[in-house]
């Protein structure tokens, strides 16, 4: 059963002669981790912004639990690449911030915040200031904050793009652990091919100008990690390597097509 459904979505910004997205249809169901991958200009961030309710489509329909998406909502938690944390607040207050805005009593919101910090392995960091945290720790706080409101769907906008390679791998593995424990459906966008193949249960490849889905893949590598197989073993599996190379070739062919159009 689909929780989130996009039906023939197109998006065009005011003053732009061309749509940024064209005829996008997809569904996100329980326990899916849907990853959108594509070159620059393929509309990945625009697609996430539509689902988040930050902008409205120029055509088509987006529903969550059969209710039209109209504006931002706590039912769609968002984790940004830029952590967007409050530097004047400590970690606990940052995680509890959305609950405070929703009028949740202090003891209940702090209890929930502590539970989410434990989920992302940050117990003991409650009273640290944001400036005292590493990049990976800040992203853990952002993830805990998004989960604190118990959203129906978790949206992630290139959440690990600014991290070093080692921390990025740690965060990928943490995300899979959190995804398994919470059973939250996740929609994540990335420009990193190996990350996309490793994390996704479902992978959509977007072509640019305008952004449209050109291929869909059903994968199980992230599920294998969540079931206990090591990331190293998975990423050295010939099937993983073959899938990664297939996706790489597809993305490069789309990029080459764009470059030919620009030279024409």
UniProtKB/Swiss-Prot annotation:
Pfam families referenced in this protein's UniProt entry, alphabetically: ABC_tran (PF00005)
This protein's UniProt keywords: ATP-binding, Cell inner membrane, Cell membrane, Membrane, Nucleotide-binding, Translocase, Transport
Topology versus the membrane: Peripheral membrane protein
Reactions catalysed, as given in the entry: taurine(out) + ATP + H2O = taurine(in) + ADP + phosphate + H(+)
Primary residence: membrane
Domain ABC transporter: 4-233
Recorded family membership: Belongs to the ABC transporter superfamily. Taurine importer (TC 3.A.1.17.1) family.
Protein name: Taurine import ATP-binding protein TauB
UniProt source species: Pseudomonas fluorescens (strain Pf0-1)
């Amino acid at each position: 059963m689909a929780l989130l459904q996009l039906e023939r979505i197109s998006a065009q910004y005011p003053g732009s002669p061309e749509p940024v997205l064209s005829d996008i249809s997809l569904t996100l169901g329980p326990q899916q981790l849907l990853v959108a991958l594509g070159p620059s200009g393929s509309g990945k961030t625009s697609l996430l912004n539509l689902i988040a309710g930050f902008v409205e489509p120029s055509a088509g329909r987006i529903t969550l639990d059969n209710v039209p998406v109209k504006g931002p909502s706590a039912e769609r938690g968002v984790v940004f690449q830029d952590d967007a944390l409050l530097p004047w607040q400590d970690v606990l207050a940052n995680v509890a911030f959305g609950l405070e805005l929703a009028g949740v009593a202090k003891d209940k919101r702090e209890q929930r915040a502590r539970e989410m910090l434990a989920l992302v392995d940050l117990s003991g960091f409650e009273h640290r200031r944001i400036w005292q945290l590493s990049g990976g720790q800040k992203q853990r706080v952002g993830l805990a904050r998004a989960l604190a409101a118990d959203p129906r769907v978790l949206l992630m906008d290139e959440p690990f793009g600014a991290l070093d390679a080692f921390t990025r791998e740690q965060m990928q593995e943490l995300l899979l652990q959190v995804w398994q424990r919470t059973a939250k459906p996740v929609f994540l966008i990335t420009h990193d091919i190996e990350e996309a193949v490793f994390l996704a249960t479902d992978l959509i490849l977007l072509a640019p100008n305008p952004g449209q889905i050109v291929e869909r893949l059903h994968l199980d590598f992230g599920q294998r990690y969540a079931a206990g197989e090591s990331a190293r073993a998975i990423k050295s599996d010939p099937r993983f390597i073959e899938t990664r190379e297939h996706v790489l070739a597809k993305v490069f062919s789309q990029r080459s097509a764009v470059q030919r159009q620009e030279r024409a």
